[in-house]
Amino acid sequence: MTNSAKKPSYFTEAGLPYGREGIRISVLVNETLLDAKSEYGHIQVFDTAFFGKMLVIDGIIQTTVYDEFVYHEMMVILASLRIEKPQSILIIGGGDGGAIKQALRVKSLKRIVMAEIDMTVIDVSREFLPEISDGAFDDPRVELIVQNGAEYVRRHKAEFDLVVLDSTDPVPRSPAEYLFTEEFYHEVKDALEPGGVVALHGGSITFQPAEVTTLVQRLRRVFKYVDLYPAIVPAYQLSLFGFINASDQPQAKTAEVERWMQNIEGQNKYLSSEVYETLGVLPPYIQKELGL
């Protein structure tokens, strides 16, 4: 008698840029919804047993419907709470639509610009992961530009209160690699209004500590204040993930944040004022490992 049960299928994530060796994350896949290539990368969408639908680009998990809100609140809402009533935001990347969804919740924002290099990512996300954008791409307040984000930044000076770098990872020789350089951070600073904020993902604190440290050090040579905030986004290697804010003005105090939270439409799922108060706290062993 033969066992005809279907063998479970797992997606195993590729090695992380500048990440530690010896570990990979595998996710049980119910169904492969898309496996295609665009001009800029290999795009896959899986329906998974734990995370639900999951977007993968070049073998690296980008987002899932299960926990995208943690990442996008930490990228967009956190930065918006550093300035009282920001008026304008530029999102570079963010083709899944989660960042613009969060930006639309910031009541004071009058200008929301998104520069995404790969229209295919937007089309795929709209078709297979509409829960993440939740209609944000169709909102008339959003100015969508299909262009290399670095080129867009160079042409705009002192225009934005917030710049969110929601690109793919800094894979060598990829379009995103330049977006993690000190040269580009200077260009971003030029695109910001005085006292503006840039927000970016710094990689896994657990598995990419060298990348996190390098990015913080680069930003410190450009901005007066650079703050690293850890949060657990389960899809990102089940580890502490680093979010970075950089600005020439310090982070807001908790009392200010509690007041400025009124500028956010609806209720945050992750970023409460209580969570904010402890965000910058890193365990001693991590501080030592990062050398920051």
What do the PLM-derived regions correspond to, one by one?
Residues 2-16, 63-197, 206-216, 220, ...:
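The AdoMet/dcAdoMet-binding core of the Class I SAM-like
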Residues 2-44, 217, 238-292:
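SAM/dcSAM-binding transferase cores
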Residues 36-38, 48, 133:
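Short, surface-exposed loop/turn motifs at beta-strand boundaries within globular domains
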Residues 43-51:
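N-terminal glycine-rich anion-binding loops that anchor highly charged ligand groups
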Residues 56-57:
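A general beta-strand register signal
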Residues 223-234:
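Conserved S-adenosyl-L-methionine
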